Amino acid sequence: MYSVFANIRTVGDFFRSIKWAWQRATKGYCDLDAYGVGDWFLNTLPDMLESIKNNRVGFPSVLLEEGMEHYGLKSMDEYNAASEELRNKIDDYGNEKWGEILSEMIFLLREANEDTCSKVNPYEEEYRRVSEEFRKKYGEWGEKLLTEEEKAKAKKSGSHPIYLPSHLPEYKEIIELYLEEEYKISEYQAKCKDKALEMFSKWFDSLWV
């Protein structure tokens, strides 16, 4: 679980962190968690599943049945009558499969989280560079690109058109490449989240140590 003390900068932050820690201790969650349940889920669940995986002492019965089928047994009577060596093989099969299932859920949830996703936008560094260059040359919102007519209108209305790096030919290509890659990464993260939730629902009753 991510710490409530992670971003303390002021006295107010400190006292809020104490409050959140008390809320977690007394009711299992705090206001910070409720501000973003999705973030809480993606930050917390992988570590919980990791704990289940590392401390498990059994596996779902359906995986025992799968192991029996794998080794040609059709009933619990046959399993009970089998040699100890064969029963151990079946148990090892189920335990290994359960570990793989938990590992896959952990992986998918971490990939769905933008803070832990393995996918990196190859244009990130260049995007940051041109964004900073644009800001220094033309202002935060492209104020230095305003025409005289736009400046005159801005004096009357109190607002002016906003210009972004993508509006200039020199930056347009890298911005488009960056945004296209961001879209691909977002799609990938969404698919990982959906698959993880599907698995979470399927194995919900088996998620215990």
Task: List where the protein language model places each region.
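Long, non-globular targeting/processing and low-complexity regions
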Residues: 1-204
